[in-house]
Swiss-Prot record:
Catalytic activity: 3-deoxy-alpha-D-manno-oct-2-ulosonate + CTP = CMP-3-deoxy-beta-D-manno-octulosonate + diphosphate
Enzyme superclass (EC): transferase
Main location, first listed in the record: cytoplasm
Family: Belongs to the KdsB family.
Native organism taxonomy: Bacteria, Pseudomonadati, Spirochaetota, Spirochaetia, Leptospirales
Protein name: 3-deoxy-manno-octulosonate cytidylyltransferase
Function, in words: Activates KDO (a required 8-carbon sugar) for incorporation into bacterial lipopolysaccharide in Gram-negative bacteria.
A Pfam family hit: CTP_transf_3
Length: 246
């Protein structure tokens, strides 16, 4: 069981809502460079690579001094892309999936998720969550909710508000899209039986949960700024200016 940790940033050029998103400029740098830079501030990784099926992204990453791997364009999910990269680097015992469209990724969040995974090597994977703010609507299906037990193990992920506010006001936690996998579990992930939870919720992590795997949840106090649309990009640019990054 290797203690080496590999960070992987999947980046696709094709996007229905925002084509070419990884190369969208934030100031003078493309988004993927910001994501790579902030992820590289983490103390957790022994190696950090971008996984992309597009040579334009690949060349940009190499151009700013990052490491990139060209992957098959035919992967049905991001996890499949991560698996291909993990096969290329067989000496890493923990594989971390970092979203390429989160240019403001906090190193402390990465370290929290990875720290939880290294503490519990018997847990198949770990992820993160953050409490909902008063401005957020738990009924928004694009904000995935997670409930977890007193030991920090996920019970369920849903696009619906969970738990229900039947008697009193429930406390909601929003799932954050970062995962740390135990290598052996990741490499056998596609052998897991299909999950009806996964199908109806359209949430890939439910396949692992329904098949009895343990998903640890690191509770963060703040969320990363994600980019799903050009409007989101403008929000990130404004926040980066406030932080003095631009």
């Amino acid at each position: 069981m290797s203690d080496q940790i590999l960070g992987v940033i999947p980046a696709r050029f094709a996007s229905t809502r925002f084509p070419g998103k990884p190369l969208a400029l934030i100031g003078t740098k493309p988004m993927i460079q910001w994501t790579y830079h902030h992820a590289s501030l983490s103390k957790s990784f022994h190696r950090l690579v971008v996984a992309t099926d597009d040579k334009r992204i690949h060349d940009v990453v190499l151009g700013f001094g990052g490491e990139s791997v060209l992957t098959s364009p035919d992967h049905p999910t991001g996890t499949d892309r991560i698996i291909e990269v993990a096969e290329t680097y067989p000496n890493y015992g923990i594989i971390v999936n970092i979203q390429g469209d989160e240019p403001g990724m906090e190193a402390s969040l990465i370290d929290g998720v990875v720290g939880l995974k290294t503490k519990h090597r018997n847990w198949e994977m770990t992820t993160a969550a953050v409490p909902f703010t008063s401005a957020e609507d738990p009924k928004d299906p694009n904000k995935v909710k997670v409930v977890f037990d007193n030991k920090g193990r996920a019970n369920y992920f849903s696009r619906s508000p969970i738990p229900a506010s039947f008697k009193g006001e429930a406390k909601y936690h929003r799932h954050l899209g970062i995962y740390a996998y135990e290598r052996d579990f990741l490499m056998n992930y596609n052998q897991l039986p299909p999950s009806d939870w996964e199908t109806v919720e359209s949430l890939e992590q439910l396949r692992a949960l329904q098949n009895g795997s343990t998903i640890g949840v690191y509770l963060s106090d703040k969320a990363n700024l994600g980019v799903d649309s050009p409007a989101d990009l403008e929000v990130v640019i404004t926040e980066f200016k406030k932080k003095g990054l631009l």
